[in-house]
Amino acid sequence: MKKKLLALFLALVMVGAVLPGCGDGSKDPGGQGNNGETGEPVKGGEITVGIAQDLDDSLDPHQTVAAGTREVLFNIFEGLVKPNSDGEMIPAVAEKYTLSEDGTTYTFTLREGVKFHNGQTVTAEDVVYSINRCAAVPEGQEKPLVAAFSAVKSVEALDEKTVAVTIAQRDLEFISYMTAAIIPADYENQATAPVGTGPFRFVSRTPQQDFVMERFEDYWGAPAWLDKVTYKICENADALVMNLNGGSIDLCAHLTSAQASQLNQSFQVLEGTMNLVQAIYLNNQAKPFDNQLVRQALCYAIDRQGIMDMVADGHGTAVGSSIYPAFTKYFLP
């Protein structure tokens, strides 16, 4: 039986590690060569991804708050721009954009022929609606639906393919907020049956069981390799391990090294850093931590590598701040 396409993220930085894997089974994951080993990707097939939480949050991309739900919806929705694998903002629903000399007006040119999953073509009106919706302050609240949009002064459709977004003052981080999902202006069921422009379209959600999506054939960009992805809801990480070994799921993330060690030898495990920092924060206003020498003594006394060896089999990176190593731009001069 083929050795299945495998695993994904690892987790970590300071103290805990996360490992994922994928085991034998009958479904073809569509991402391995003819010999069953990882190689040139092959279009088609399906996978089942195990997750240790129910997606019981709203599926509306502007209202969901759970990180796990956002990870899934990232496949369904896109903004005017989106991050690439290096974290750089690249065009998505927008083909390009320009920034005014004073840094307060972003002018986006929409990509030709981008379609929503319901078959409608994305228009400037949809973009204006989406951004205004994020910037609006819901009744009874003090902040916009999306807090980062509090700086938006106006959103205007200059023509059928051009939208101008003006903010109160220059903010070089604002372009990253334009990853907010573009949604149809006339669609009202986002919370339960989401419609976006991403490479996968929503199929179904069964509470406490699964979330299913399939490749969107009219996607504007490179088509997804897989025909179908099912997220299977598991009770906890131990249940993920059991389902992996049993063959009912093909892939998962966020296991500890101890849990990963329970996987059989047919699994391939990949690991890498993510945005998780485990730290002890001290109250500098309380004695004896108001003394800098005491704080320094604690730092010197703690065996950080020993902690990582004990709880994470040596995985992780000792850091000197709450900024995780993968956030490389922070460390640029």
Briefly describe each language-model feature range.
Residues 85-88, 167, 171-228, 236-238:
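Gly/Pro-rich hinge or "lid" segments in bacterial periplasmic/extracellular proteins
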Residues 95-139, 288:
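Aromatic- and charge-enriched surface segment that lines or borders ligand/interaction sites
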Residues 217-261:
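Ligand-site clamp/hinge motif
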Residues 98, 102, 143-186:
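Surface-exposed binding/hinge segments that line
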Residues 50-101, 132, 195:
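N-terminal lobe/hinge region of extracytoplasmic solute-binding protein
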